[in-house]
Each structure stands twice: as C-alpha cells, then as structure tokens.
A protein has these predicted regions:
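Short glycine/proline- and aromatic-enriched beta-strand/turn motifs that initiate or cap beta-hairpins
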Residues: 3-63, 67, 127-128, 256-273
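Gram-negative (and chloroplast) outer-membrane scaffold detector with strong preference
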Residues: 7, 49-145, 153-160, 168-173, ...
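Feature marks short, surface-exposed loop/turn motifs that line or immediately flank catalytic pockets
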Residues: 14-20, 68-70, 113-115, 184-186
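Outer-membrane beta-barrel translocator domains and adjoining extracellular loop/strand segments
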Residues: 20-29, 72-79, 117-126, 189-197
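Extracellular loop and loop/strand-boundary signature of outer-membrane beta-barrel proteins
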Residues: 28-37, 76-84, 145-152, 252-256
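Surface-exposed loop/turn segments flanking beta-strands in extracellular/periplasmic regions
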Residues: 30-32, 128-137, 199-209
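Predominantly the C-terminal beta-signal and adjacent terminal strand-loop region
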Residues: 169-274
C-alpha cells in the first residue's frame, strides 16, 4: 500500500441522480398534475485529486471536480416547457482509509466553487387579442412565442462526499482504479440572470418580433387580468415567469427551494505515486 507517499489521480465517470427533489410540475394534462423530480447532479463527472498517505492505512485527499449535467424537465404545461441542467465546479477534502492494499474507502466534505444551473424556457401561447386590446374583435387571437435562458447562481453550499474503490497496480508507480461515489449536496439559490431572449407575436397571419420590454408588458397585463376560471392559469403562468424576465433577479428571502445536486456515480481513473 502507499505509505508516506504523495499521489495524484485523474478520473472520469457518470453520476446518477440521488435524493431527488421536486424541480417543478407537469401540467400537460390539466386534470392530472404531477411533480417533476430529479437532481441536477446527474451527468458526466471528472475529477483531479492529490493526496498524501501519512500512515500505511490513513491518508488525506484534496479533489477538484467538474459536472456536465444532463437536461432535467423543470416545468411543463400546455403553453410552457422548461428544462434545466447543471454546470458545476466543486472541491472536496477527504480522509482515505486503506482496508487492504487494493480496497479503500474515503469520506469528507464537499462544496461548489463555481458554475451555474441553466434553465431554458419555451413559451407558446394562443391568447385572445382582446385581453391586451379591448378594441380587438372577439375572435382574433394572438400567437405568442418566447424563448429565453436563465443562469441561476447559488450561495456556497456544503455537503458530504464518500466513496469505495478498488485499485490495481499496472506499473511501479501507476495504478488504475474503479470506484463508486456518493455525493449529497444542495445549493441554496441566490440570483438568476437572463440571457438570450427572443420573442414573436403572430396576429392574423402576420408575425413580428417583440422586445423584452413589450413581452413584459404582455405578462403584466395577464397578471392584472380580472380573476376568472378562464384567466386563472394564465395569471399564474405570468406570475411564475415574471422574475425570469429580469436582467438580474435576487431569490434571497423569496422562499426559493435549494437546487439538488446529489448523485451516486461510478468513476474510472489512474493514479501516479511519487
């Protein structure tokens, strides 16, 4: 086993979602709304680690990691489709214990040091033009489409990381390893930033681009529409997306749920011992 020795290792693998939380709701079928659960921690993972064994059995390890997360559906209904993914950099400090020369376990603390949760929103709504223009004919509809992205940034989180692995020597100072890793961490939401906004409206077959400010005006009109069974869902929709239309929006104190980043992953890697 490594004894009073330093080492570095690189690894790559895939993390599967764990400790799923509700990311949003699927109301595609208005009579049966379901929760959309998941974890932004699902996706491809890479790590660079450095460690030192100060005893035949015990060592300490510092690791830097990157997550390229898979798309997760976050909200869905008849006019809205939202999905999100994580792009995150993390750091961890762990104790490593050699059970045998080949088998080891590690456990420690982990935090995120950079990255974002990216949410993509597509809106496609057919609305009575009269909602926005009282003089419009009762039958005229406006077809409104919008596409935009938001980058969500969080506060510094702290979580637990642990793993069990098996290493086998392939040369004097080189070993391959395979390991299972458990990560439990949630990122408190801090702020979101709008990017890549585009929108159009189509009235009587004529399509024109509309600005962010015009689109915000449409949403404000929906929010202020008289309450009725016909407008309830639209009012809720406008209220839901209005924070996402701000260039920068602070979520602090708004009761926003933490973003889940937990995973159970499998990694393959190589270690070089000095």
């Amino acid at each position: 086993a490594m004894y009073s020795q330093a080492y570095i290792s690189v690894s790559g693998g895939y993390g599967f979602k764990a400790h799923e939380k509700t990311l949003g709701r699927d109301a595609s079928n208005p009579t049966a709304t379901t929760d959309l659960k998941g974890s932004y921690g699902e996706g491809y993972q890479a790590q660079l680690r450095g460690g030192y064994f100060f005893h035949k059995r015990w060592g300490a390890e510092l690791a830097l990691g990157y997550l390229h997360g898979e798309d997760m559906p976050t909200n869905k209904n008849q006019v809205l489709n939202m999905k999100g993914h994580g792009r995150a950099y993390g750091a961890s400090l762990s104790l490593v214990f050699n059970i045998t020369d080949n088998l080891y376990v590690r456990a420690g603390g982990v935090t995120k040091i950079g990255g974002k949760t990216e949410i993509q929103t597509e809106l496609n709504a057919k609305l009575p033009l009269r909602m926005f223009n009282p003089m419009a004919p009762a039958t005229t509809m406006v077809d409104m489409k919008a596409d935009f992205n938001n980058n969500f940034h969080g506060k510094i989180p702290f979580g637990f990381i642990g793993g069990i692995g098996y290493r086998f020597k392939v040369a004097d100072k080189v070993a391959f390893f395979i390991e299972g890793e458990y990560l439990n961490i949630n990122v408190p939401r801090k702020e979101s930033k709008l990017k890549d906004f585009s929108a159009t409206r189509t009235i009587a077959g004529t399509t024109s681009a509309i600005s962010l400010q015009e689109f915000k005006t449409y949403m404000a009109t929906l929010q202020n529409a008289p309450a009725s069974p016909q407008t309830a869902a639209l009012k809720q929709l406008a209220t839901q997306i209005s924070p996402l239309l701000e260039d920068t929006y602070s979520w602090e104190g708004k009761g926003a749920p933490d973003a889940p980043y937990s995973s159970i992953g499998v990694h393959f890697g190589v270690t070089y011992t000095f």
